[in-house]
Protein backbone atom coordinates (compact mmCIF):
# COMPACT_ATOMS: atom_id res chain seq x y z
CA UNK A 1 0.00 0.00 0.00
CA UNK A 2 1.38 3.37 -1.04
CA UNK A 3 -0.46 6.34 0.47
CA UNK A 4 0.41 9.30 -1.74
CA UNK A 5 1.63 11.46 1.13
CA UNK A 6 5.42 11.83 0.85
CA UNK A 7 5.73 13.09 4.44
CA UNK A 8 4.09 10.82 7.02
CA UNK A 9 1.51 12.34 9.36
CA UNK A 10 -0.97 10.58 11.62
CA UNK A 11 -3.76 12.71 10.12
CA UNK A 12 -3.02 11.52 6.57
CA UNK A 13 -0.98 8.35 6.12
CA UNK A 14 -2.12 6.73 9.36
CA UNK A 15 -5.75 7.53 8.54
CA UNK A 16 -5.41 5.72 5.21
CA UNK A 17 -3.84 2.75 7.00
CA UNK A 18 -6.65 2.72 9.58
CA UNK A 19 -9.25 2.49 6.83
CA UNK A 20 -7.39 -0.35 5.11
CA UNK A 21 -7.16 -2.21 8.43
CA UNK A 22 -10.91 -1.74 9.02
CA UNK A 23 -11.59 -3.23 5.60
CA UNK A 24 -9.23 -6.15 6.22
CA UNK A 25 -10.95 -6.89 9.54
CA UNK A 26 -14.05 -7.90 7.56
CA UNK A 27 -12.16 -10.38 5.41
CA UNK A 28 -11.75 -14.06 6.29
CA UNK A 29 -8.70 -14.38 4.08
CA UNK A 30 -5.94 -11.92 4.91
CA UNK A 31 -3.55 -10.88 2.14
CA UNK A 32 0.05 -9.94 2.78
CA UNK A 33 0.26 -6.23 3.40
CA UNK A 34 3.28 -4.02 2.97
CA UNK A 35 2.97 -0.32 3.73
CA UNK A 36 5.23 2.37 2.34
CA UNK A 37 4.65 4.95 5.09
CA UNK A 38 6.67 7.86 3.68
CA UNK A 39 9.21 8.78 1.04
CA UNK A 40 10.16 12.34 1.92
CA UNK A 41 13.87 11.76 1.37
CA UNK A 42 13.77 9.26 -1.50
CA UNK A 43 16.36 10.47 -4.05
CA UNK A 44 13.99 9.94 -7.00
CA UNK A 45 11.36 12.07 -5.25
CA UNK A 46 13.84 14.89 -4.60
CA UNK A 47 15.05 14.64 -8.21
CA UNK A 48 11.47 14.84 -9.50
CA UNK A 49 10.81 17.98 -7.45
CA UNK A 50 14.10 19.49 -8.63
CA UNK A 51 13.22 18.76 -12.26
CA UNK A 52 9.79 20.36 -11.88
CA UNK A 53 11.40 23.51 -10.43
CA UNK A 54 13.96 23.66 -13.26
CA UNK A 55 11.19 23.26 -15.84
CA UNK A 56 9.23 26.17 -14.35
CA UNK A 57 12.36 28.36 -14.10
CA UNK A 58 13.04 27.71 -17.80
CA UNK A 59 9.52 28.95 -18.63
CA UNK A 60 9.63 32.27 -16.78
CA UNK A 61 11.53 35.42 -17.71
CA UNK A 62 12.63 36.43 -14.20
CA UNK A 63 14.86 35.02 -11.47
CA UNK A 64 13.17 33.96 -8.23
CA UNK A 65 14.33 35.74 -5.08
CA UNK A 66 13.01 32.83 -3.05
CA UNK A 67 11.25 29.49 -3.39
CA UNK A 68 8.49 28.80 -0.88
CA UNK A 69 7.96 25.11 -0.07
CA UNK A 70 4.38 25.12 1.21
CA UNK A 71 3.16 21.99 2.99
CA UNK A 72 -0.30 21.26 4.32
CA UNK A 73 -0.36 22.24 7.97
CA UNK A 74 -1.41 20.22 10.99
CA UNK A 75 -2.36 21.46 14.46
CA UNK A 76 0.75 22.16 16.54
CA UNK A 77 -0.60 19.91 19.30
CA UNK A 78 -0.08 16.91 16.97
CA UNK A 79 3.59 17.83 16.66
CA UNK A 80 3.79 18.34 20.44
CA UNK A 81 2.44 14.79 20.89
CA UNK A 82 5.22 13.38 18.70
CA UNK A 83 3.92 13.42 15.13
CA UNK A 84 7.05 13.49 12.91
CA UNK A 85 5.38 15.34 10.01
CA UNK A 86 7.03 18.71 10.76
CA UNK A 87 10.48 17.09 10.73
CA UNK A 88 9.79 15.24 7.47
CA UNK A 89 8.70 18.48 5.78
CA UNK A 90 11.86 20.28 6.84
CA UNK A 91 13.95 17.30 5.72
CA UNK A 92 12.39 17.40 2.25
CA UNK A 93 13.00 21.14 1.97
CA UNK A 94 16.61 20.73 3.09
CA UNK A 95 17.24 18.02 0.49
CA UNK A 96 15.68 20.15 -2.25
CA UNK A 97 17.72 23.17 -1.06
CA UNK A 98 20.92 21.18 -1.45
CA UNK A 99 20.20 21.09 -5.20
CA UNK A 100 20.34 24.91 -5.41
CA UNK A 101 23.20 27.13 -4.31
CA UNK A 102 21.78 30.41 -5.59
CA UNK A 103 18.13 30.33 -4.46
CA UNK A 104 16.92 30.16 -0.86
CA UNK A 105 14.07 27.74 -0.14
CA UNK A 106 11.80 28.37 2.85
CA UNK A 107 9.32 25.96 4.46
CA UNK A 108 5.81 27.20 5.26
CA UNK A 109 2.49 25.57 6.20
CA UNK A 110 -0.89 26.20 4.63
CA UNK A 111 -4.58 25.29 4.92
CA UNK A 112 -5.09 25.95 8.61
CA UNK A 113 -8.57 26.39 10.00
CA UNK A 114 -10.15 26.83 13.40
CA UNK A 115 -8.83 28.79 16.39
CA UNK A 116 -5.99 26.48 17.47
CA UNK A 117 -2.33 27.04 16.65
CA UNK A 118 -1.00 25.16 13.62
CA UNK A 119 2.53 24.53 12.39
CA UNK A 120 4.27 27.76 11.45
CA UNK A 121 5.27 29.84 9.60
CA UNK A 122 1.89 30.16 7.91
CA UNK A 123 2.04 30.32 4.12
CA UNK A 124 -0.59 33.03 3.76
CA UNK A 125 1.07 35.32 6.32
CA UNK A 126 4.46 34.70 4.67
CA UNK A 127 3.09 35.84 1.29
CA UNK A 128 1.99 39.11 2.92
CA UNK A 129 5.38 39.96 4.46
CA UNK A 130 7.83 38.79 1.77
CA UNK A 131 7.58 41.91 -0.44
CA UNK A 132 8.39 44.12 2.57
CA UNK A 133 11.53 41.98 3.06
CA UNK A 134 12.62 42.57 -0.53
CA UNK A 135 11.46 39.17 -1.82
CA UNK A 136 9.25 40.33 -4.69
CA UNK A 137 9.73 37.44 -7.13
CA UNK A 138 8.85 34.00 -5.80
CA UNK A 139 8.23 30.47 -6.93
CA UNK A 140 6.02 28.24 -4.80
CA UNK A 141 6.26 24.47 -4.63
CA UNK A 142 3.92 22.17 -2.71
CA UNK A 143 6.03 19.04 -2.17
CA UNK A 144 3.54 17.44 0.22
CA UNK A 145 0.88 17.19 -2.48
CA UNK A 146 1.26 14.41 -5.05
CA UNK A 147 -1.21 16.06 -7.38
CA UNK A 148 -2.74 19.47 -7.75
CA UNK A 149 -5.98 20.04 -5.87
CA UNK A 150 -8.02 22.84 -4.32
CA UNK A 151 -5.23 23.56 -1.83
CA UNK A 152 -2.70 24.18 -4.60
CA UNK A 153 -4.85 25.51 -7.44
CA UNK A 154 -7.16 27.75 -5.41
CA UNK A 155 -5.40 28.47 -2.11
CA UNK A 156 -1.91 28.98 -3.55
CA UNK A 157 -2.22 29.79 -7.28
CA UNK A 158 -5.17 32.16 -6.93
CA UNK A 159 -5.57 33.41 -3.35
CA UNK A 160 -1.87 33.25 -2.49
CA UNK A 161 -0.84 35.06 -5.65
CA UNK A 162 -3.48 37.77 -5.13
CA UNK A 163 -2.30 38.33 -1.55
CA UNK A 164 1.38 38.43 -2.56
CA UNK A 165 0.82 40.91 -5.41
CA UNK A 166 -1.50 43.07 -3.27
CA UNK A 167 1.27 43.21 -0.63
CA UNK A 168 3.78 44.58 -3.15
CA UNK A 169 5.08 41.42 -4.82
CA UNK A 170 5.89 41.52 -8.54
CA UNK A 171 6.20 37.96 -9.86
CA UNK A 172 4.59 34.81 -8.46
CA UNK A 173 4.48 31.36 -10.04
CA UNK A 174 3.43 28.04 -8.60
CA UNK A 175 5.30 24.97 -9.79
CA UNK A 176 2.71 22.29 -10.58
CA UNK A 177 2.69 19.23 -8.34
CA UNK A 178 4.22 16.07 -9.78
CA UNK A 179 0.78 14.92 -10.97
CA UNK A 180 1.12 12.40 -13.83
CA UNK A 181 4.61 13.49 -14.90
CA UNK A 182 7.06 10.85 -16.08
CA UNK A 183 9.27 11.54 -13.07
CA UNK A 184 6.35 10.93 -10.69
CA UNK A 185 5.25 7.73 -12.41
CA UNK A 186 8.85 6.47 -12.36
CA UNK A 187 9.09 7.30 -8.65
CA UNK A 188 5.86 5.48 -7.80
CA UNK A 189 6.88 2.46 -9.89
CA UNK A 190 10.25 2.39 -8.13
CA UNK A 191 8.69 2.62 -4.65
CA UNK A 192 6.24 -0.18 -5.35
CA UNK A 193 8.81 -2.43 -7.03
CA UNK A 194 11.35 -1.86 -4.24
CA UNK A 195 8.78 -2.92 -1.66
CA UNK A 196 7.34 -5.99 -3.37
Where do the language-model regions lie?
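Extended amphipathic ligand-handling, pore-lining, and cofactor/metal-binding catalytic surfaces
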Residues: 2-196
Amino acid sequence: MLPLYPQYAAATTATVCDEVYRTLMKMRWQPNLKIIPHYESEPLYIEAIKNSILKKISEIKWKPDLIIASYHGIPKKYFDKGDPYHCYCHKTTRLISEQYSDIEIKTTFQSRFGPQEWLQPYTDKTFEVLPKQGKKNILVICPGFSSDCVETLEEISIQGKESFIKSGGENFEMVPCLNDSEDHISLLKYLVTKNL
